[in-house]
Every structure is written in structure tokens, then in C-alpha cells.
Amino acid sequence: MPRESYRERALVIRTYDLGEADRIIVFLTQHRGLVRGVAKGVRRARSRFGSRLQPFVELDVQFYVGRELESVTAADTVGFYGSGIIDNITCYTAASAVLEAAERLSLAHDEHDDRLYPLVVDTLKQLQHAPEPKLRLDTFLLQAMTVAGWAPSLYYCAQCQAPGPHHAFHPRTGGAVCGTCRPPKAADVNPEVLHAMWLLQHDRWAEAITLITAQEQGASARDSSESVTHEVPCATAIHRLTKAHWQWHTERKLASLMVLDQT
């Protein structure tokens, strides 16, 4: 009896060598979430499609259903997003963090959400020429957490739903918190930072960049008249809060994100 087969759009998340010539590949697929497959002979020089099975390449993959691993018998390139990423360490690390986060979200949910795959693809496309790769990653994490049901509250108090603007953020509570509900360990935050995060969360990139630029220029002007710098740059604050919210809800740090913060 012939084995069941199917075709899927897919991105390579990670790979493992198997034996002398084979490779196990973890894919993020468009409609089936994470799929683990084995590609026979792809490490040989004569492999027809082995060179395509790498991160930042979108593929149309032919899978045959297996007991534990699918068999990968064909893979056609749909899009290559490595240009502008693989030659820039910051962009490369941010893009790697996107793939790592997508895998983590897929593992955390039994049911696949079709919104995740296009979000990953769009982010990789943007990272090819992104002047602010870390901010692009933060945007992805905010939007991906929305898909997962972990979106931080950024205007209303996460505890009592009182409207903002608010001046504190607490991941465990769910995001922004008012003065009445503020827990002892909540982080102080400029309301403009929360506003910029809200814009990024809702895919309003241009407005967010305008706000971030204006806020940082204003902070720089204020700090230049004082002997001590008091304000954290807006983009830095966004990154810290986004990372804290992600780590609280996933209970795991992203290895690529830790590397990115050191670059």
C-alpha cells in the first residue's frame, strides 16, 4: 500500500546530521505547525535539493508520512530570505531568534494557528534590509504573543482594566498596571514606551518609529542639560519589556536573543 503524502510550504527551523549522508530537519509548515522529517542522502554532493534545506529559505516540500519522522523527497525554493541577513551578525541573530521563538510557540500549543507562519515569513523578509533588526524582532515577539494569547496589555491596566496612560509594567500581571494595582516589583515605564509597543503590536511600524525617534530625541535634549542621564532610550525599554514578557509566559529564554543582546 502506498504511503500517504502531502505538500506544504515550510521554513527550516533546525537540522541534525544522521548517519553519513542523511539529515533530520525540523520544519515550520504553513498549515501543520512543526513537522520533523528525514531527508535521505542530502549531505552528498550530488543531492538534488540538499543545499536548499537551510534556514531563511521558504520551500514547497513533498512529505511522505512516517511512523516517527516524515520522509522528505522533494523541496522547491519559494523564496530565499538570507540576502542581507547572513552577512550581518545582528540581523542573522535576530532572524535566528525569530525561528527559535516560532518553534517555542508551536511546541507550547497543541493546535497550530495559521497566523504564525506568514508572520514569520514577513519578519524574515523585513529583516533582509532592516535598519533596526532588534526592534523588528521585538515587533515579531509582540505580534506572535498576540497569536499565542499572551499579548501584554499596553493601554488598559492588566488587573482592573482602568484606561491609561500608565507608568508601570509587570509581566506576571499581564502588562501595564495602574498605580492602584501596581505590584511591588513592577518596572517603571514611560507611557510613550507602552504607546510605541502598542503601535508595534498592531503592525503600525511607521508610526512607532516616528514616536520612538521623537521620544529619544526629547530624552537626549533633556539629558544634555543635566549631569546625569536619567532616561532609558525608548527602543531599549521596548526590548527589555518585550523580552521580560516573553520569558515570563514561555518560562524559557531564547538562546539567540541572549546572543543578540551581547552584540
Please report, for each region that a protein language model flagged, where it lies by residue.
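Non-catalytic alpha-helical scaffolds and adjoining flexible linkers that form interface surfaces
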Residues: 1-263
